[in-house]
Design a protein with these regions (language model features):
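Catalytic cores of nucleotide-enabled group-transfer and carboxylate-activating enzymes in metabolic
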Residues: 7-10, 25, 135, 141-152, ...
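A cross-kingdom feature marking solvent-exposed beta-strand/loop segments within repeated
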Residues: 22-42, 71, 181-193, 202
Length: 277
């Protein structure tokens, strides 16, 4: 689902700006309903605001008229060297109120990522000191790219989702326990460095919070460029998974108590994040 949302937003932007674009930030994603095998899902993307080089897009997943998931994304028009490119196309708002809300959302986001250049080179491992961890690494092959050059943000998000889900399955003791896990939400995800064909990416994850039926996983992605030897931070975000039974109903997760200093600090930060959501 994450990949569908991200890719739908990209296609919408590429068509509107008549050029290449990349996903810069995916705002809080909320999954309202579960999806079963055989369900027919429609993905919609709508431009809500256009800046000098960036576009704000709302993405929705619907089953009939039922809202399954929604998200907001910020995409940047870029040249062949992935440098921001001015949007020449004039796009007038259909709804001025929606336009203004999207503009404020963009301004708020930009305030929170003023240090994005510093974050780009922060490759600190956030899983050190945690007991429940997972790592996943892969080489970026053509099937993981949009155009044979730039890695698809949607595909990276899908791999992150799968990695976090596996960690949660391990935590609940699958396959020796009842139930499965589903993705319930993804926090704001900003991409600090582009991933290119041939790069290696490393995904590091840890369980940072456990509630009655849910688990929060911190997921950090770094990339390694084999030709230059440079390692950069791609993104760090939080996925929330819910433990469900065979009927899709939430069921309790085994009790969790933070033990290490790192776990205790992150647990408190997770509580604050949940209060703000």
């Amino acid at each position: 689902m994450l990949r569908w949302l991200a890719d739908a937003g990209l296609l919408c932007v590429v068509k509107a700006v008549k050029g290449q674009a990349v996903l810069a930030t995916l705002d809080d994603v909320v999954f309202h309903k579960g999806v079963k095998l055989g369900d027919i899902i429609s993905i919609y993307a709508e431009i809500q605001f256009v800046g000098r080089t960036s576009v704000e897009v709302e993405m929705k997943a619907l089953r009939g008229n039922e809202l399954i998931a929604n998200a907001y994304g910020s995409y940047v028009k870029v040249d062949r060297n992935l440098r921001p490119l001015k949007i020449e196309e004039i796009i007038e708002p259909d709804d001025q109120e929606i336009w203004n809300v999207a503009m404020r959302r963009r301004e708020e986001r930009l305030q929170k990522i003023k240090d994005r250049n510093e974050r780009r080179f922060d490759v600190t491992n956030p899983t050190i000191g945690f007991r429940y961890i997972i790592t996943n690494s892969l080489n970026v092959t053509p099937d993981l790219t949009y155009n044979g050059v730039t890695a698809s943000a949607g595909r990276i998000l899908k791999i992150m989702d799968d990695t976090g889900g596996i960690l949660c399955l391990n935590y609940i003791g699958y396959p020796y326990s009842n139930g499965h896990v589903v993705t319930a939400a993804v926090s704001r995800t900003s991409f600090y460095s582009p991933v290119m064909l041939g790069d290696y990416i490393l995904i590091r994850g840890c369980i940072s919070y456990v509630g009655r039926t849910s688990m929060e996983v911190t997921l950090n992605v770094i990339k390694y460029e084999p030709q230059s030897g440079i390692t950069e931070h791609v993104t760090t975000t939080y996925f929330t998974f819910v433990h469900i039974d065979e009927n899709g109903k939430p069921i309790p997760v085994k009790q969790y108590s933070p033990e290490t200093d790192e776990e205790k600090k992150e647990y408190e930060r997770a509580i604050q994040r949940r209060k703000k959501s």
